[in-house]
Amino acid sequence: MINTILFDLDGTLARMDQDLFIETYFKKLGALVASHGYDPKQIIQAIWAGTGAMLKNDGSMTNEECFWKVFFDSGLPDAKGLKPLLDHFYANEFDTIREITSPNKLSRKMIASLRRKGYKIGLATSPVFPRIATELRIAWAGLAPTDFDLITTYENSHYGKPSEGYYREVLQVLGSAPEECIMIGNDVDEDMCTERLGMSVYLVTEHLLNRHNTDYSSYPQGSLSDLAAYLEALPDLRFSYRRMAQYHETDQMGIIYHANYIQWFEEARVAWMDHLGYGYDAMEKAGIGSPVLEVHCSYHSPVHFHDTVLVRLRLTEFTGTRLRVSYEVSDEATGALRATGESSHCFVERSTGMPVSLKKTHPDIYELFCKQMRK
């Protein structure tokens, strides 16, 4: 079952002409280093050499370590003194390159929909930039780093894209198997190669890159609009609890009283635990309690008597001592959003009320929740 979606960034989620980006990037960087008395051509050559080394990295070091090793050994005068200057460029001037890009509302919509439905999302962008630069490129696409469960950068990657090692490392970090993933990108060579690992793929044909004129007719493909429709058709992975609104739950306005939504959250959470095979009754018999620390609810549209709603639930955080659950209430017939919310809980020893770490005291319950986080 598919539970993980990997996206390329440039030319996929972000509108970008790759050649124009490289030209603009080196033009701005060259101007900065020239203003400090350095030869831009020499520095650009050293950057290309370091980038090439990252693409061939064998996993023995991070791409960051690989890049600077080659850069420092490039023969540049005062090569080590250039690092603060390059750091300054990424922190202060790199963002001006956004002028050649534009955000895409569809990207925001797709990511939001996938997160809402419980999918793990990885940004499998070429890990040759530092995190600060990658996060800026994410912002250019109208997205945020928090939209992704993993973002590959030169700090956290040990291989270059599209090596098999790169993708296997991505899968390992996300805790996903190849057959559970879809890789989405606009590069026939660097993105579609994941099919050989057992992943499903989708080729975005806007800003298509096909350096070797490879026949790509066999791949699922289309525009970003086509992709949005393709992803929208993916099933909702969240646990779903069906509930008919009762007459006694309404208020004098004829709609469900606001406090009852909190009760529905609890009903859904209890049903979810039963579904996992370790209900609240079993947990209490094991001597564990799970009191509520916080609960929040936002109301979007009213529910009336006899309406049937679905309360969809997802585990969003688990530390071994605490967990956080998100909820979404929608009309079963129309899909209209009624309410959203979340609750946070801790774990305590019922006999004493003292906090406990499930990893130490109840590893079976701990692993149960860990498994849900890996989904």
Model-derived segments and their meaning:
Residues M1-A46:
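Active-site neighborhood of HAD-like aspartate-dependent phosphohydrolases
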Residues T12-L13, I256, L337, P355:
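Hydrophobic "anchor" residues
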Residues K41-A91:
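A metal-dependent, Asp-based hydrolase signature
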